[in-house]
Amino acid sequence: MGQHRSQATLFLLSGIVLLYVVVFSGLAMARYNTFHASTFDLGIMTQVVWNTAYGRWFETSIDRATNVELIGSYLGNHVRPILVGLSLLYRLWPDPRLLLVLQSVALGAAAFPLYWIAHRQTDDPKAALIVACCYLVYPALGFLNLVDFHPIALSIPLLYMAYWALLEGRMTLFWVAVLLALFTKEEMVVPIGTWGLVNLLKRDKRCVGIGLLTMAVVWTILCYGVIVPYFNDGQPYRFFQLWSHLPGFSKSSVQGGTAQPLAEASPETVILFLVHLALPLGFLPLLGPASLVVALPTLTYLLSGSRPAFHSVGYQYPAVLIPWFFLAVSEGLQRLRRKASRHGGLRFYRLGLVFLLIGTIGANVPLNPVLLYAQAGAFQPDPYHDQIVEALAQIPPETGVAVVNRLGPPLANRRVLVVLEYPSPLRLDHVQMADYVLLDLVDCRTVPALDPRAEYANIVTQVLQTGRFRVRYWSGRILLLERGTPSEKELAAVLDYVADLVEQKRSCWP
């Protein structure tokens, strides 16, 4: 009877996972199709995967470590060997939407090993189903799935698989999953190393702990001491500057810029971030300290970092926290279940499940990613959608293009793609390597300046005044330039249009 119930529950979970994958794949592609995705980061990942697929391993013109040469190696910024595996699939369907679908499939499929873990720890298939379903509607997971593509999202199913394999004693699968998780991003050394320390404290898991620590230390040395400096002109990991305000971090020891403005987290921001993480879980991770402690170093460096996105569930950064929080939930339920069996009552165990359900449902009222994205119009075409399509149709494949952030993803399958807003200051010599320039003359949301409207007008003016580009297509706010001798009358009209936007103090969006 128990086995039949477990099979029925697993069958139900399969249907729910399939629904999740279909819905989130569709929404992610709708966001892409309506030009609401971003070159940072979907365009970056697409270009790196496309280049790698055709033998130019980790080559990028968008997210290189320095602003000296236009084309460089992505390995000077981040170390993500898992992109090599994705590049093999990309040859079958060379389209950014492949990455979006793969991400949805991976995040949805992660519910299965989480279910197996919770089932094993609680011996309760219904509770395991609740945990898996709460994972699928966890707000931070939904935002992660919708905000472009990030390889670190793949670490979630891999870590669940590793944890389950360790419980089952399937050590080959365990080590393979851990290694692949490390390959999703260099920062994975933090939770893997911490997990190793936790296992060192368990008498029967000390060998596992030593192995995890060894892998984390070796990968740390390779990433931060060898690979990144080698591809970054001998300079250290440039994102260390996000913690340069802390003791021990010298501002002179870091180099390069970041695509987002910097700001330390206020106490209110920290509290709100923690509530957004913990409330949907009914605060149950507090009952699973063995897994919760693995998340604490990552949580600490996110809270102490000076990038505002670090302190929000609306971006990809909580991806490193999500698996450990849900593993702590499962461990917490296991603890409540054991206490219930010893004291002859299931009241607190059931109360824990109620807290989890209420927290999940309650948090999704104000913080549902699908509803928030829909309210922002992220799945609907803008009134000038057809103009963007018409402009894109006039750009030949693999020609060099300079573009604004939101219009870059469909153009990422090319070696030369220059994003005009970043890195700052604008390198006109890089822009002049492009054959086309595609602009939304209104959208200045991602310009890193105190007055983005004026700075964006300055960028457009600089591009036009190079004298290298003429108007190929102009309809309303969408402008396509191509290499050639410009018409002074057309350029003057564009400059007047941009100047009027500044004079009117036109908002960057919509």
Can you annotate each of these PLM segments?
Residues M1-G26, H119, P125, C207, ...:
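Start-transfer (signal-anchor) and selected internal transmembrane alpha helices
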Residues M1-Q3, P191-V217:
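Perimembrane helix-loop-helix junctions
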Residues S14-L18, K126, L213-V218, L336-N368:
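Signature aromatic-anchored transmembrane alpha helix within multi-pass, membrane-resident enzymes
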Residues V23, L27, T34, K205-P297, ...:
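Membrane-lumen/periplasm interface segments of specific transmembrane helices
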Residues L88, P96-T122, M161:
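Transmembrane-helix motifs of polytopic, lipid-linked glycan transferases
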Residues A109-V137, I156-P157, T172-L173:
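Transmembrane-helix signature of polytopic, membrane-embedded enzymes
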Residues R120-T122, P151-L154, L159-L173, L200-R203:
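Membrane-interface transmembrane helices that cradle and orient dolichyl/undecaprenyl
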Residues L292-R342:
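Hydrophobic/aromatic-rich transmembrane helices and adjacent perimembrane loops
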